Swiss-Prot record:
The lineage of its organism: Bacteria, Pseudomonadati, Pseudomonadota, Alphaproteobacteria, Hyphomicrobiales. This is Glutamyl-tRNA(Gln) amidotransferase subunit A. The keyword ATP-binding applies. GO terms for biological process: translation. Belongs to the amidase family. GatA subfamily.
Amino acid sequence: MSELTALTIAEARDKLKAKAITATELTDAYLSAIDAANDAINAYVAVTHDQARSMAKASDERIAKGEAGALEGIPLGVKDLFATKGVHTQACSHILDGFKPEYESTVTANLWADGAVMLGKLNMDEVAMGSSNETSYYGPVKNPWRAKGSNADLVPGGSSGGSAAAVAAHLCAGATATDTGGSIRQPAAFTGTVGIKPTYGRVSRWGTVAFASSLDQAGPIARDVRDAAILMKSMASLDLKDTTSVDLPVPDYEAALGRSVKGMKIGIPREYRVDGMPGEIEELWQKGIQYLKDAGAEIVDISLPHTKYALPAYYIVAPAEASSNLARYDGVRYGLRVPGKDIADMYEQTRAAGFGKEVKRRIMIGTYVLSAGYYDAYYLRAQKVRTLIKKDFEDVFAKGVDAILTPATPSAAFGLADEVLANDPVKMYLNDIFTVTVNMAGLPGIAVPAGLNGQGLPLGLQLIGRPFEEETLFQAAHVIEQAAGRFTPAKWW
């Protein structure tokens, strides 16, 4: 069975088309793998055995009739942030206890319309707030990777830790994820997988639990660049239900793979050489530069002067939007309700019991920066900084730069229940140092594995592109992947 779960989406698609395997066989192989591994890894918070089998059966029937969709019979995991009709959707928060939506998110509806099979809902940081998948109400996810000679558990990154871990451990062929400040790219880098955060507006946000609406964007996590391109094609669409959705044709991203990068101008931002960056990250970056240079790309030094303000500005804008978005969870119409002596007391008791520590922290920060006395000093100033960050990128792209290469994370995956990080949220927030600028500017960014560190843990590089030019990112990421190879964890679970 494990040989079936080892297939990439592209390989499985070809075998299904050739009728060498059936969607039912493939789905059963994944369900068996999940049942055997989930107690150890905790990637899934709900496994939809019956639904998966009936979807696979329907796929086999369509394949037999010659009516196969682009993802026909491909078993996928869905981050618990996406509404799935009649299926557990709780954003891994106690506040949404028992919530089963009566509607389907646009992203998942697009995937099912193309024939994909749902295996279940994936663990994540509560309401997508976190960088280690330790804030989930359902407990932490364990990274399928371990350091050489060690049995210590590592985090898979966050907030899409369940998506990244499930893809790396072959518990799904690919997964949906979301990215507000790095929640696709950082876990992808920590698990040796590929994750792309599309341009803001490329993929519909409708039916996805909102964290920070001006920053949130859905995208795929997959085993390789080709699989990410295949998934992205199905996920992206114009959606009139999302006012930020952009009416642009969705290209065939897979067709961009293998195109030459000769003459492509790749920018290297000097501001990303941060103090205290480990030598192994600098080394990886240089390797990535060399891979692209060897393939014919032109490497240029660039400056993004407002980079150093991105993280503090992000941690004002994102909590501000979150405090507004999360006001709707009050125990009245759905989810958890804790009785109180009157309605105000019920709200208070429900929200106190329903939200975890990190979510409460961010709601309080957000409410504080939006309050009358501090709005101008914090929120307004952060929005002005955001405009300057966006302009930095526009200036660089105006000079002919096609893509920007940076590290994806400042380190490899760190230990589960790390006391230093648990006691210092700012240190945890620094995990997003290379990724938040992309969300602040609404640009596309992809994380691609580029090597292993001295302890045998995966490290990723990030490519940042012009708005709606995801094809360029797939093209350049494919070059790095071809040079660096692919990375799979040794099985311990």
